[in-house]
């Protein structure tokens, strides 16, 4: 029997699950493929305003929360400045402009049909087993509403290569992508 305050086991003996990487493709201001490696001992996300800190956290929230319950850019939301949503992240919206008719509209990095991928890779500390959470989102060039966003979510018991996902999803044909994910045991 253990004394009060004494642990029954050390944390080194427990197989914990820790976030090890966040990968985004065409998410917010991150155009193309970007990966953030997370140190299992801890990672500090810091930087100037507009450097992408909230953008990375919001990518994680997109995978971890039900779509109807995601609140983006909570730091700005406290100041009533929250103007981010799933479509604005997919489009890479930044600022606004006035169009030829005098209407204010968003400025976007990606106006065309676009695919966005978010991957959170988790790793067990002792066994080194991996789990990948995936979110794949795509919209047509004329889409501006949340209801227009097509979504595919997957949980895989192995790391999944985002470049391979994109290759399977060329021409916005979802069938080869779904076949690829089904072929991965446990996805």
What annotation goes with each model-predicted range?
Residues 1-183:
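Extreme N-terminal "head/tail" segments of very large remodeling/mechanoenzyme assemblies
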């Amino acid at each position: 029997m253990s004394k009060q305050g004494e642990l029954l086991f050390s944390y080194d003996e427990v197989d914990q699950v820790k976030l090890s990487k966040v990968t985004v493709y065409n998410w917010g201001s991150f155009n193309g493929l970007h990966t953030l490696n997370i140190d299992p001992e801890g990672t500090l996300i810091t930087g100037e305003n507009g450097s992408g800190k909230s953008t990375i956290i919001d990518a994680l929230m997109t995978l971890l929360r039900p779509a109807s319950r995601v609140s983006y850019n909570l730091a700005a939301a406290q100041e009533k400045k929250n103007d981010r949503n799933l479509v604005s992240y997919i489009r890479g919206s930044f600022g606004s402009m006035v169009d030829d008719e005098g209407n204010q509209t968003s400025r976007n990095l990606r106006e065309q049909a676009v695919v966005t991928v978010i991957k959170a890779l988790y790793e067990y500390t002792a066994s080194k087993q991996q789990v990948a959470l995936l979110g794949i989102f795509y919209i047509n060039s004329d889409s501006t509403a949340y209801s227009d966003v097509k979504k595919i979510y997957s949980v895989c018991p192995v790391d999944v290569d985002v470049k391979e996902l994109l290759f399977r999803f060329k021409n916005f044909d979802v069938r080869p992508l779904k076949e690829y994910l089904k072929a991965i045991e446990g996805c």
